[in-house]
Regions:
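Interfacial helix-loop-helix linkers and transmembrane-helix boundary segments
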Residues: 89-94, 149-158
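Canonical alpha-helical transmembrane segments
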Residues: 60-63, 75-89
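Aromatic-anchored transmembrane helix interface
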Residues: 122-147
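Juxtamembrane membrane-water interface segments that cap and precede transmembrane helices
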Residues: 45-63, 118-121, 197-212
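Interfacial loop-to-helix junctions that mark the boundaries of transmembrane helices
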Residues: 50-69, 91-96, 125-129
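Interfacial/capping segments of alpha-helical transmembrane domains
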Residues: 41-52, 182-191
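Membrane-interfacial, low-structure loops and terminal tails that flank and connect transmembrane helices
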Residues: 1-16, 88-94
Length: 267
């Protein structure tokens, strides 16, 4: 009986480890990648175009490394699906609703290959680091979530990490709302710039929230996606202190939304 109990405990531990490894890329997409902010200097490759009036060299803080991370996560997801299907012999699940998404991914790749400016299709362009790999990655992420998030336990584990990421983002946003922007502090600048750390000039006025999302308008999209989830959790969670926490996060994001002056989110 004792042996059976120990074996049962070991099996549960192994299942938990496998569960964490499976939801890890989803956690990265929901909670980690949105926070990535770091300086990246690059050549625009646009100087040959008559319509471009900017400098040949530019700097990015909010998009490039998010792009790299998302591509890595997408590759991880593909490998994880292959392992689960062939290594663990899980049943491959498919739904006809994904056919349009698969067609979109294929057309996107063909379009990138056929483009006269394929360099930008595969590497991204000035202030728009969204190459074809990212567009195809969105399709991979959508299917992976459909394949993995199929039971209540997995969803609960994922939401916990998602809430952690939202909490960090809300804390950063509140610092911007109350004109104590963490990214403008000495420590914040050291975290987002390579040595030697330089003093940065921000395009957004002090008191306007932008989180780590490049454009204050993106704050509107972020808030309108997250707030309904938090409100739903307020009404479905049993523990009182959880409800209070979710309500506080929802209220914080609404405040951050108005501070961002994002018409997209308010509308």
């Amino acid at each position: 009986m004792a042996v059976y109990t120990n074996l049962n405990k070991n099996l549960k531990k192994n299942e938990k480890k496998v569960s964490i490894s499976i939801i890890l890329p989803i956690i990265a997409v929901l909670a980690v990648i949105p926070l990535i902010t770091y300086k990246y200097e690059y050549y625009t490759h646009l100087e040959t175009f008559d319509w471009y009036r900017g400098r040949p060299q530019a700097a990015d803080f909010f998009l490039h490394y998010k792009t790299i991370a998302l591509i890595i996560v997408s590759i991880y997801m593909v490998l994880a699906i292959i392992y689960m299907v062939w290594g663990e012999e899980r049943k491959f699940v498919w739904d006809k609703k994904f056919i349009p998404l698969a067609v979109y991914a294929v057309i996107t790749l063909v379009s990138a290959i056929a483009s006269k400016n394929s360099y930008f299709s595969f590497n991204g362009i000035y202030e728009q680091f969204e190459p074809v790999w990212i567009l195809m990655g969105y399709a991979v992420i959508a299917y992976y979530c459909f394949y993995v998030l199929r039971d209540e336990t997995t969803v609960k584990h994922t939401i916990r990490w998602f809430i952690a990421g939202i909490s960090v983002m809300a804390a950063l946003g509140l610092s911007q709302v109350f004109k104590c922007d963490f990214l403008r502090s000495d420590l914040g600048m050291k975290l987002i710039t390579p040595p030697p750390h330089e003093k940065l000039t921000f395009n957004f006025e002090l008191g306007r929230s932008y989180l780590t999302l490049y454009n204050p308008n993106y704050v509107g999209y972020y808030a309108t996606l997250i707030v309904p989830l938090l409100i739903a959790l307020v009404f479905t969670t049993k523990k009182l202190w959880h409800r209070i926490g979710y309500a506080f996060l929802a209220a914080s994001l609404v405040l951050i939304l108005f501070s961002s002056q994002s018409r997209a989110g308010i509308v």
